[in-house]
Amino acid sequence: MRKLMIASVRTSLCAVVLGALALPAIAQDNPTLTVYTYDAFAADWGPGPLLKEGFEAQCACTLDFVSADDSISALRRAQLEGDATEADIILGLDTATIGEGMATALFTEHQLDLPDFDIPLEWTDEVFVPFDYGYFAFVYDTQSIATPPASFEELIALPQDFKIVIQDPRSSTPGLGLILWIKALYGDEAIEIWEGLAPHVLTVTTGWSESYDLFLSGEADMVLSYTTSPAYHLIAEGEDRYRAAKFDAGHYTQIEVAGILASSPNQELARAFLAYLVTPEGQAPLPETNWMYPVLEPTGGLNPGFAEMIDPQPALLLDADEVTANTRAWIEEAFSTLR
């Protein structure tokens, strides 16, 4: 009987030890892929939860989205954390901030055989992968504004109590997009446009979500957003009162991208996620949660409501190297008029 008891204890101890030794293996078999992104992407109503569900169903992993006010803020966080960062991917930089991202030396090549994208330019970048795109615009409420401005000059000419809300270009990609939009149209005369806009700027918010909430609450007449933003109200709410003001001179293009950090211990898994993101299945959640155009035909096609959005042509886009070289000076130029 004593021998049986001793044998039983030994068996139990072995089971405990073996179980403890197995824990790291189990954890390794179910790794966590951490994606730093902007708040709207990771929100309950954003594409994050749907992408998490779809990717986790096939990856034997946990997909964790960590949000900041905007993607530039997410990049700054990863910079501060250095090699100790938990981020495997930064998602939400764009064609205006790719150069800044590369300058950090945080990223590694994606090593993916990418599909042919339906975007406004040929994609050859070996580090960043595009996942959606759109065009910047000012959104207004037709119940308050019958005839919106069709140019920056017309906006400037409105009474000073006509207010817009914009985003900080140092922390927000739409905010930087406005800088580039004006620079693309006016070049060296951009500061004159900023001087004219300054009296109309109600506030400059850190990120897009805060500014759009201010607009919807009636604090401002127009908000810097996207030509596709009214698609949300039309498709999700059945409400057609919100529109994007069509500027005859054109709208600035934004292509959003994701990149893998060189410090990531999960680079193979990170590549798998980026590959998934640019499949029809991975693209499917984006149009009706992020309210941008997909980079390729999504599963189920594109909702017909998007066909009712304004035509952004001519589409504007500055040379990436020019943007990288001049961003700081252009931001300072704009802010000199807003102080």
Regions found by a protein language model. Give the residues of each.
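A ligand-binding cleft/hinge motif common to bilobed small-molecule-binding domains
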Residues: 96-100, 216, 220-241, 290
